[in-house]
Curated annotation (Swiss-Prot):
EC assignment: 2.1.1.163
Positions with a binding annotation for S-adenosyl-L-methionine: T62, D80, D102, A103, S119
Species this protein is from: Beutenbergia cavernae (strain ATCC BAA-8 / DSM 12333 / CCUG 43141 / JCM 11478 / NBRC 16432 / NCIMB 13614 / HKI 0122)
UniProt-recorded name of the protein: Demethylmenaquinone methyltransferase
Catalytic reaction equation(s): a 2-demethylmenaquinol + S-adenosyl-L-methionine = a menaquinol + S-adenosyl-L-homocysteine + H(+)
Lineage, broadest ranks: Bacteria, Bacillati, Actinomycetota, Actinomycetes, Micrococcales
Family matches, as InterPro entries: SAM-dependent_MTases_sf, UbiE/COQ5_MeTrFase, UbiE/COQ5_MeTrFase_CS
Amino acid sequence: MPRAQLDKDPHDVAGMFDDVARRYDLTNDVLSLGMDRLWRRATLDALGARPGERVLDLAAGTGTSSADLADDGVDVVSCDFSTGMVAEGKRRRPDLAFVAGDATRLPFADGSFDAVTISFGLRNVSPAVAGLSEMLRVTRPGGRLVVAEFSTPPWAPFEALYGFYLQTFLTPLAKAVSSNPEAYDYLEESIRDWPDQLGVAALLHEAGWRGVGYRNLTGGIVALHRARKIATENTSAGRG
């Protein structure tokens, strides 16, 4: 497979994730030096989902975060564009509801969910605003969104160190543990091309979300973005 480019057909990107599905979680643990689990836990804490609430876990991968939500009594639907990820998730947790779906054309009715979360997947949605608009559509008025995504460390020396890690160590580590190391060339490219914290906040506003805010994790390597759908919003608002 050729080196991943950011303007690739979305189905090609999904195919790359199909290829890495079986060892996806292990690879994430290794490449993040174990931080991936902490970032996902922080995301769920920020979401604050309560037992009985209906939550959409978008770009759910193999369902790692969905499983934690379900174990806490949340009615969670796991949705991913990669059929390989969905199949692997069903194999691991057959009790969870997995759905294959495109974030820009979600297969759910307006106002279906109390909350939506997407972890490390918004970079893969093209265009991102269309995906955020769809997330708004399927969220009930007054509902909330939490996005965890790679971001830009605000302290320049740390940003330089992080960039050195991405360029020097990411691919060799991926080759050691991943079933498709070239997919992690795409990871590096997509991180470098992705907007910073304020840029993502602007995308959220453009899509119709309100109460937008963020906080940095691990020095800004990751940012947690939070937003709400205003209670008086028409459920059709925000369509892309």
